[in-house]
């Protein structure tokens, strides 16, 4: 039986990772792409989202919201790519992707010799991903280690068991993850990250902006990403992270989009609050 025949199709929260892959595949096709993800189309195809996908809603407001989510995925991907490159340039050689989904950075980015990249996720998405990687004959550009564990369980122990060393700096990435976790789970996750982080560690987070659940969740289709969002960012994300021992900067989507040459033409609908694109350093 082939990988394609054995492959378990995406469902639940992790199915949203295939939708993210579709967005990255579309960006990759652009002449002025902010990044290139050669594996994204294969992930989207395997998940049934390429070349076709669910049509945009008829309602104009709902259509704009869908396009906004796709745009935010492109900008956050570029933001975290840059953060990872900066961390590598500073000498960090351990990378942990929490809720890794269909992330292909181990395959599409250039890594310094000695880099170890840990992908933490549950078994189902990791197995799905592995079957696509075999099909594509993909070779990682660094030492890639998968860690099949639920983030509600003892993932630090599972990470240590495969060689993560908390005594040396790590760069942690939680991309498109925290918005799916209740606030107490977010606090526990951050406490666990902090406990495994030596001085000089880096962290990149994406947080749901204040009010995003109300704006996007009201008419979200069952099973859609927005229908599963449960938490938003604190009013003061920089202060929140300082309380956990991190020196952080927050950036808005609008700010980063302009910096990347993709300015948002429409004026903000409300007063700009602290942004949900977070970079942080462990002191």
Curated annotation (Swiss-Prot):
> Where is the stretch described as Disordered?
258-283
- Sites where the protein binds S-adenosyl-L-methionine: 121, 150-151
Care to name a GO molecular-function term for this sequence? methyltransferase activity
Q: Which SUPFAM superfamilies match?
A: S-adenosyl-L-methionine-dependent methyltransferases (SSF53335)
Which keywords are on file for this protein? Answer: Methyltransferase, S-adenosyl-L-methionine, Transferase
Q: Which Pfam families match?
A: LCM (PF04072)
Which biological processes are named by the entry's GO terms? methylation
**What EC designation does it have?**
2.1.1.-
Q: Does the keyword Methyltransferase apply?
A: yes
State the PANTHER family in the record.
Answer: S-ADENOSYL-L-METHIONINE-DEPENDENT METHYLTRANSFERASE YKTD-RELATED (PTHR43619), S-ADENOSYL-L-METHIONINE-DEPENDENT METHYLTRANSFERASES SUPERFAMILY PROTEIN (PTHR43619:SF2)
What this protein is reported to do is described as: Exhibits S-adenosyl-L-methionine-dependent methyltransferase activity.
For this chain, the family text in UniProt reads: Belongs to the UPF0677 family.
Which NCBIfam families would you find in this protein's record? mthyl_TIGR00027 (TIGR00027)
Q: What is this protein called?
A: Putative S-adenosyl-L-methionine-dependent methyltransferase SAV_474/SAV474
